[in-house]
């Protein structure tokens, strides 16, 4: 609700954070119960909640054997993935892509698109390729890091076979393939992970944002074969894997695993595709509930966003001026989608 008491339909979800929506009662109870029992303890003690999260995650993970490291954000998760790749391979070059966003810390900003200010130096070399290119991957490359769908760039889908070609190139040259699933993971595409949506399994992947539905948590997954090459103590975190974050993430996984939950996400994504031709929308890109609506020439996404706000609907922007971004709670209702479609059809933009 707004400060004046007015209500809004949130179709942006805080950049894919509000997996279960605002003020989810079940999640609130889980967090309150955990706070009252144990809000924090040292990492020197075993914490059964971490094992419980692993058990909850395991059925939905990509094929293979995985280990996971807990931190507090997507940037941290990506930093840890890069550190693991550099150590496991002994190489010093990371391949990244134009349009990418991986975070604002030193290493993460180094592999983010050049339009975002970076730190003056980083402990590795970056080879930046055009989106969709597999040129430049050779025996000097430690890892290729990418978002399976580039969200901030404008919900840009990968070209056909691009991810499979990257997988083949990495295998050919002994480089690791890393997926940044900070936004595409946790059921967002109607599959638990983007690797399942695109049928390409990476050597490591990261997630955050919606992993604990608004409670700070970053996760770095790495295959057992890579993990066995890493020195003990390579990664560490004071708050990572704390009891509150673990409790929230377990609740998220419980909800995602419910029968028909992911099918519901897929169905809503298809329903939102009906926005094409409604008012200023000329195309819809993306998958599941990570979508970009392309706005017709002569109008901007910002104008449409502001006009929708007058209808009580919150949407988002991105780095593409003609793309309106949607990343709502996965608990969205079909009636909510109909409310958006009606509003688009009846918009007055730029008047």
Per-range role (PLM):
Residues 1-351:
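Conserved N-terminal phosphate-binding loop of PLP-dependent enzymes in the Aspartate aminotransferase
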């Amino acid at each position: 609700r707004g400060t004046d008491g007015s209500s809004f339909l949130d179709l942006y979800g805080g950049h894919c954070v509000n997996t279960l929506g605002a003020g989810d009662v079940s999640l609130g109870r889980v967090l309150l119960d955990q706070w009252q029992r144990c809000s924090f303890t040292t990492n020197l003690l075993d914490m059964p909640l971490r094992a419980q999260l692993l058990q909850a995650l395991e059925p939905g993970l990509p094929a293979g054997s995985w280990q996971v490291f807990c931190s507090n954000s997507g940037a941290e998760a990506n930093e840890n993935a890069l550190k693991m790749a550099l150590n496991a391979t002994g190489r010093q070059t990371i391949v990244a892509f134009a349009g990418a966003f991986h975070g604002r810390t030193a290493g993460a900003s180094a592999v983010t698109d050049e339009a975002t200010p970076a730190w003056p130096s980083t402990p590795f070399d970056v080879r930046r390729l055009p989106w969709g290119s597999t040129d430049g991957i050779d025996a000097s490359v430690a890892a290729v890091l990418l978002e399976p769908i580039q969200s901030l760039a404008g919900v840009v889908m990968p070209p056909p076979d691009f991810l499979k070609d990257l997988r083949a190139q990495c295998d050919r040259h002994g480089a690791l393939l890393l997926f940044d699933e900070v936004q595409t993971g946790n059921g967002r595409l109607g599959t638990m992970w983007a690797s399942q949506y695109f049928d390409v399994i990476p050597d490591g992947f990261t997630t955050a944002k919606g992993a604990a539905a608004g409670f700070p948590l970053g996760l770095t997954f790495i295959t057992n074969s890579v993990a066995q090459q890493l020195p003990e103590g390579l990664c560490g975190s004071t708050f990572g894997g704390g009891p509150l974050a673990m409790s929230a993430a377990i609740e998220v996984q419980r909800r995602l695993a419910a029968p028909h939950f992911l099918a519901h996400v897929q169905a809503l994504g298809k329903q939102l595709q009906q926005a094409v031709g409604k008012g200023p929308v000329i195309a819809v890109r993306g998958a599941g509930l990570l979508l970009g609506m392309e706005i017709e020439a002569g109008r901007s996404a910002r104008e449409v966003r502001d006009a929708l706000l007058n209808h009580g609907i919150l949407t988002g922007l991105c780095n593409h001026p003609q793309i309106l971004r949607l990343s709502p709670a996965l608990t969205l209702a079909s009636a909510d989608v109909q409310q958006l479609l009606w509003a688009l059809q009846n918009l007055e933009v730029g008047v």
